[in-house]
């Protein structure tokens, strides 16, 4: 009687255990399927590629456990496989959150650059005759962008992937709107300020910080943008070899105010402020014979200046809009036109 009872209890107990193993196997199968989906969706969306490799290995491990006979699983169980798979899944999910946060941070950084340019142009166009509506549109775009940026800052602490992705996308959209509004304002200013097609309004014109300018060594009251000075020095050295004297520099970088005082709307000689390459530190006016077409000095410069990154622009050529033999520019001056 005792033996019979024991058998019955063992049988019942064993049945319960078998049921538990089946349920546990279902859990592992479900978990594995979810992990496989995560492996697929996480492609290109993690910061640590090794987490996906780890997940892939744990999925293979889980699959091999699931392929084992029920009897084997009865003795070994699936607990280890489930725990390892869960840890690998967590690692991928954490890496995906990090990746999504990185996208938001990147979007915020690129927003900052667009914002800086927009604000510079907004300020530079104040009181310059541009339609107020065009400026108001940029201001509105900047306000909307600032709000999105503040919201994104809060979202950064979220672990919700969809929310993070939405924040990054929204920042990108806002940046585009600000960029378009900035270009519209810049074009509007250009249209009313720079009458000639070879001129381009630039918010930096006449406002180059002194740290970005460099003194011309043989003409110390004159400055050009620091990055174009080495070419000018080399050009001068070659010129000196040919003519025994330095290039005569009569004009170089001009501040916004000095360009404004030179500008005479009834004469094409000086460009309106904001439209001159002198204001960018990329132009010099040269004398010592160069101020006349077809002199030896002018001809020499025409033949040699480009070797050193300097050129005589089309508008100043004989027959150009303003024939100015003396006006020379860095080749960089026309890069943006
Ligand atoms: Zn000039």
Predicted feature descriptions by range:
Residues 21-73, 90, 94-155:
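Amphipathic, heptad-repeat alpha-helical segments
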Residues 102, 106-109, 113-116, 129-248, ...:
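Intrinsically disordered, low-complexity
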Residues 217, 221-232, 252, 277, ...:
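Solvent-exposed, acidic/flexible segments
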Residues 205-220, 265-268, 272-287:
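Short, conserved helix/loop micro-motifs enriched in His/Cys and acidic residues
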Residues 269-337:
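Catalytic cores and adjacent binding grooves of peptidoglycan-active enzymes
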Residues 62, 81-92, 145, 171, ...:
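Append "Rare intracellular matches occur via the same short Y/T/C beta-strand/loop motifs
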Residues 249-262:
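Acidic helix-start/capping segments at beta-turn-to-alpha-helix junctions
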Residues 1-26:
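Hydrophobic single-pass membrane-targeting/anchoring helices
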């Amino acid at each position: 009687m005792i033996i019979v009872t024991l058998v019955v209890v063992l049988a019942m107990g064993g049945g319960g255990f078998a049921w538990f193993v089946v349920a546990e196997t279902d859990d592992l199968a479900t978990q594995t399927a979810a992990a496989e989906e995560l492996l697929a969706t996480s492609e290109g969306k993690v910061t640590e590629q090794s987490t996906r490799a780890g997940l892939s290995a744990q999925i293979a491990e889980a699959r091999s456990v699931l392929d084992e006979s029920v009897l084997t699983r009865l003795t070994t169980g699936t607990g280890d496989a489930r725990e390892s798979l869960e840890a690998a899944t967590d690692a991928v999910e954490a890496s995906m959150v990090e990746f999504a946060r990185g996208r938001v941070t990147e979007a915020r950084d690129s927003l900052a650059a667009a914002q800086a340019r927009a604000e510079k142009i907004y300020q530079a166009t104040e009181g310059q005759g541009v339609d107020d509506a065009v400026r108001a549109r940029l201001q509105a775009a900047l306000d909307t962008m600032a709000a999105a940026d503040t919201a994104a800052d809060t979202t950064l602490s979220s672990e919700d992937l969809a929310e993070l992705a939405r924040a990054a996308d929204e920042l990108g959209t806002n940046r585009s709107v600000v960029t378009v509004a900035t270009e519209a304002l810049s074009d509007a200013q250009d249209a009313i300020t720079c009458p000639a097609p070879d001129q381009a309004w630039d918010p930096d014109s006449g406002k180059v910080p002194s740290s970005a300018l460099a003194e011309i060594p043989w003409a110390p009251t004159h400055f050009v943008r620091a990055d174009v000075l080495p070419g000018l020095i080399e050009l001068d050295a070659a010129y000196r070899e040919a003519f025994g004297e330095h290039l005569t520099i009569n004009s170089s970088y001009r501040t916004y105010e000095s360009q404004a005082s030179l500008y005479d709307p009834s004469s094409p000689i000086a460009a309106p402020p904001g439209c001159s390459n002198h204001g960018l530190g990329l132009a010099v006016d040269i004398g010592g014979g160069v101020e006349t077409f077809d002199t030896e000095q002018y001809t020499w410069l025409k033949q040699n200046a480009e070797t050193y990154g300097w050129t005589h622009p089309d508008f100043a050529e004989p027959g150009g809009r303003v024939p100015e033999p003396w006006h020379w520019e860095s080749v960089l001056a026309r890069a943006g036109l």
